[in-house]
From Swiss-Prot:
Coiled-coil blocks: none
GO cellular component: cytoplasm
InterPro entries: Epimerase_deHydtase, NAD(P)-bd_dom_sf, NAD(P)-dependent_oxidoreduct
Pfam families per the UniProt record, alphabetical: Epimerase
Family statement drawn from the similarity comment of this UniProt entry: Belongs to the NAD(P)-dependent epimerase/dehydratase family.
Entry's induction text: Highly induced under sulfur starvation conditions.
GO molecular function: aldehyde dehydrogenase (NAD+) activity
Protein name: Uncharacterized protein YLL056C
Database matches in CDD domains: SDR_a7 (cd05262)
Top-rank taxon, per record: Eukaryota
Signal peptide stretch: none
Amino acid sequence: MKVFITGASGFIGSAVLSELISSGHEVVGLARSDEAAAKIKSIDPAAKILRGDLKDLEILKKGATESDGVIHLGFVHDFKNFEQCCEIDRQATVAMLESLKGSNKPFLYTNGTLSLRPNKVANEQDGIDEDSKILRAVTEQVALSYKDKGVSARIVRLPFSVHGKGDKAFVPILMNIAKAAGKSGYVGQGTNAWAAVHRLDTAPLFRLVLEKGKTGQVYHCVGEQGIPFKDIARVIGEILNVPVASIPVDDAESHFGFLTCFVTRDGPVSSEGTRKELGWQPQQIGLLEDIRANYSLN
């Protein structure tokens, strides 16, 4: 199968690209720069390059129509302009979906579990939290609507933490916050749970959803259902040799900044349905072990 991947040079996309090629698929990766193109080629020389970015809608349409399937992993990670980034994502998604109408080709849209209702174990049948302000939740629903327009749309939801060597997201940011503050914090009792998955476990799941997934189905790429945030803070404290402390709710935003909505949220997520349907079984180490083994600020 010829597969077009956005975000192919990224933390998750690079693992997915390698997995697909090693499984016999032909991959075309979107590259916004010479650096991204070189990285894709360094991952696997067999990968082909399509130059452009998520704002180049005609390029995205070309990549989609000339492929047998699409995995949309690309996203502009600018948390200071998050709404604008979500709008870029929406337009890119719609452009590709429109170009695939009537083809019945698989289109995998990637969303996060932050848009699910908190304080319960969410499963694949759970819809988007109606109170969610995460704009990507709307794009997930738009993508699913194309199942009635001749596109085999499928959703893959990723947990709060996708971890592994090279991670530049939440855990490293939390470590920098802890170092600057002189303490590794959690909010209140710290019993709120984070779901997690290792980046190398995401790749087989995306391949299975591409090869065996069903139209209109949602899949959860979750290796660990829920890790108490206090445990994450404790391990970070051990690594940095700083005390672990509870941060009062009223002080959470001043301590954690834009991460406050994540560190205060209870978001356990089940992947039982995904595992049963596709036979996916995560093989890599868990988040806490990974932090101990592979995370530092050196």
